[in-house]
Amino acid sequence: MKEFPKNYNFTENEKKWQQIWQEKQIYAYNPNVAKEETYVIDTPPPTVSGQLHIGHVYSYTQTDFIVRFQRMMGKNIFYPMGFDDNGLPTERLVEKQKQIKAYNMERSEFIKICEEVVESEEEKFRSLFNQIALSVDWSLEYQTISPLSRKISQMSFLDLVQKEEIYRTNQPILWDPVDGTALAQADIEDKEQTSFMNYITFKTEQGDPLTIATTRPELLPACVAVFYHPDDGRYKHLAGKSAITPLFNEQVPLLADPLVRQDKGTGLVMCCTFGDQTDITWWKTHNLPLKTIITKKGTIDCQHETSIDGLKIKEARTKIIAILKEQELLIKQEDITHTVKCAERSGAPLEILTVPQWFVKTISHKEELLKRANELNWHPKNMKIRLENWINAISWDWCISRQRYFGVPFPVWYSKRVGEEGKILYADITQLPIDPLKDLPMGYSKEEVEPDYDVMDTWATSSVSPQLSTHGISDDFAVNKDRHDKLFPMDLRPQAHEIIRTWAFYTILKAHLHQNTLPWKNIMISGWCLAEDRSKMSKSKGNVLVPEKLLEQYGSDVIRYWSANSKLGADTAYSEDVMKNGKRLVNKLWSAAKFVFIHFDKLKGEDKKASLLDIKEKITNEFDKWMVNKLVELVKLATNELQNYEYANAMHLTEKFFWVVFCDNYLEISKTRSYDEEHKNPQGQYSSILTLYHVMQTLLKLFAPFMPHITEELYQILYSENSIHVKGSWVNYSDLNYEINAKGAEGLLEILDIVRKFKAEKNLSIKAPIKLLEVSGIVLSAELAEDLKNVTSADEIQFEMKDDKIKVNIIL
């Protein structure tokens, strides 16, 4: 018989098993298995944008719990890993890391540097994901900037062009002057900022003074109208008249519109092109002229003697206010706090510019998308409202153009041929992937076309993350249609709650437009990982936890244990106490396994190979039967929780059973029988050892999705050379049940609890002998009474039924 190792070294063992799993391809996807037997995951491709943190471990391990469970349940698993390595986040990382600016160098040179940086950063991710034992199939890896991904992303674009769901137009868009690019509505965040409400004097064309209030006086040269509410009696006499703007002396119409708030400012509002969404509405509704004074770099260009040209927005605002004061045109200023729309990544206040852009039709599909949100299985269910709220709030079509460099190019040129100037030329599907700066449309020379210099929003590509893995977009656009049909729609999208409005929404939109379907059946939402004081982790606070240090201190299984203790969808604080509990659990699993191991040589070979159902009749002891029934109940409960994506509940049930039912009670109660040193009860001994054998094996399997290394190590020592994590290794005891009265075993436990408390109060050892136990309220069977005598060290037990409740008198 082999020896049980003296101790468990997590550092050595975790590395050992990670290597073995890769070598033996335990996690390999089998493309020959039927679709119905395959479970497909749309893994979040991490953004290559900076330092790895504990949040990556937190969210990705929670997905892995479900994946490992599904594999053990017999599913053929398609579990890829991708890297979202194109777009603005990566560009910002490269610019910061290399201390360069994209606009100061050749485009090709900057792209080359980006490619070098992402290759290095992605290797760090691979290393971490292997260390935390993500059971991905690395042969399925993809990058969003790879040629294949660019091809599929461009297919998505062309398919939507063909379906008339994409258009290009010169219209107002949100512009980030810091990053120099257009943004979509989902790329912005509202920030509370202090400012001034400036009360400025205008005049009517007849010279009568008018006072308007504005927070953006620098937009005076872009003023195209002044509005009042049609029901506002103060201004009804202005109908049909014009106003003269101060400083710039431009004549603009005075118009009525119900969008004006009578209680804000003076009730007179200047409309500029453009200060906000309302300006756009008025510009379109009233067919107003366009005056563009803000450049793409966020400076003023109005070519006026006020000399604010070339100034940044805030500088121009300060200067205009000074001039207005000097000319006594500024009546007063009020301190205010208002909401400003800012770029989510750069933090810069956004401007509204009119620039030709590509848009995906979104507003016209809002009702359909709300129906899709309802069709999807949400885990947890309360997260659905976040998507519904976002869909209801959408007021712009999705702008997918970005004026950047490291991204997927639009497969588009613009004709310069005589007679078709400006005609949009699309690449043929056979040309993809293409770069319009290097390639040409069929039948055109370089001199006859102008390439589209923009790249796609990174979400335009990551929104087809399922299709990047399935290698197809639709019936007409596919690299491998058979593969796509087999894998799409997928089974699961795991992701964080803060990107429901972006990644989840855009992916649902694309699948709806491409194939009139959902992209997946289930969506599993994770929360945030917070600092121990429940504040958000940030570099500025110095509270960001680095995974490498925690892995070195605790190991992967303990970190995964901490992650498994957080409820699905909930924000969870890092906890040193939970980490210590995880370490304690690993140690207890090891010691419990060591105890059961010493008895296994007493088992017959065929009984070790048989299932619990097959050897059911050989478990003869009443308490052993009760234990197996409790185990069967646990398996059913834990399985149900995992099938419903409630991994934390499954972990809690299993851990509580292990500590309380198995270690604290069963091991202690059956210990004397298991050893049977006096050979009094060979049948009872064999029954207990069989029970130990199968309960420990089952518990290892229930813990396996959460703590893969320690369970694999113990499983190999105790049971098999085959991996515990292979397909179909889960337990199914649906047909197993012993017809016994559970009251007997439960009564034994109640009596034992009373005795333990008595000994603890008397500061006695748990093994301290007892002369007599007088028990009323229950009469135990001879088997249970013998187990009770052994575990309490009682010489004699007397039972009588004179009480309704169990009472115990202890005589030392």
Swiss-Prot record:
Source taxon at top rank: Bacteria
Position of sequence motif 'KMSKS' region: 536-540
One example of a Gene Ontology biological process annotation: valyl-tRNA aminoacylation
Subcellular location: Cytoplasm
UniProt EC number: 6.1.1.9
Catalytic reaction list: tRNA(Val) + L-valine + ATP = L-valyl-tRNA(Val) + AMP + diphosphate
NCBIfam families (alphabetical): PRK13208.1, valS
Function statement: Catalyzes the attachment of valine to tRNA(Val). As ValRS can inadvertently accommodate and process structurally similar amino acids such as threonine, to avoid such errors, it has a 'posttransfer' editing activity that hydrolyzes mischarged Thr-tRNA(Val) in a tRNA-dependent manner.
Family note: Belongs to the class-I aminoacyl-tRNA synthetase family. ValS type 2 subfamily.
PANTHER family tied to this protein: VALINE--TRNA LIGASE, CHLOROPLASTIC_MITOCHONDRIAL 2, VALYL-TRNA SYNTHETASES
Domain remarks in the Swiss-Prot or TrEMBL record: ValRS has two distinct active sites: one for aminoacylation and one for editing. The misactivated threonine is translocated from the active site to the editing site.
Name of the protein this chain belongs to: Valine--tRNA ligase
